[in-house]
Amino acid sequence: MQARAIEPELIPACRKYGIDIVIYNPLAGGLFSGKIKSKDIKPDEGRFGTKADRVGSMYRDRYFKDATFQALKIAEDAAQKHNLTLLEIALRWCVHHSELKTRAKGGNDGVIIGVSNLKQLEGNLADLEKGPLPDDVVKSLDEAWMAAKATAPTYFR
């Protein structure tokens, strides 16, 4: 969902010049775990944690916006209707519904995933192997993007 900021300019430029695209951070630093539900909740530990000093502050500045959490709520509601997780719909959307031309779509674009342990890796890989999302979930993710778009982080810093 957050990766869509690259759609209007970067993806067309890369396509024009034959450059493959590899995105990173498809789970918004773990925000798609669903553990944090509000910008007002600042955990002590973890990537968004207050003890993470500069990194925690950077991630909170990047993602802790009302619109982001509104979008996550839209996505989570859609996921729950199909017994899916936020993590799963984020990864499956990147592979099957984004403008990336992944191998699933005959291209070489890719998605870099990051994990903290083997269980997360196995779960993410299993989710990446699943097929496209139900149409109503994709529609909800489009709605979520519209909710978050105005305050979404840019692809350039």
For the regions a language model picked out, list residue spans one by one.
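Beta/alpha (TIM)-barrel catalytic core signal, keyed to glycine-rich beta->alpha loops juxtaposed to Asp/Glu
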Residues: 1-148, 154
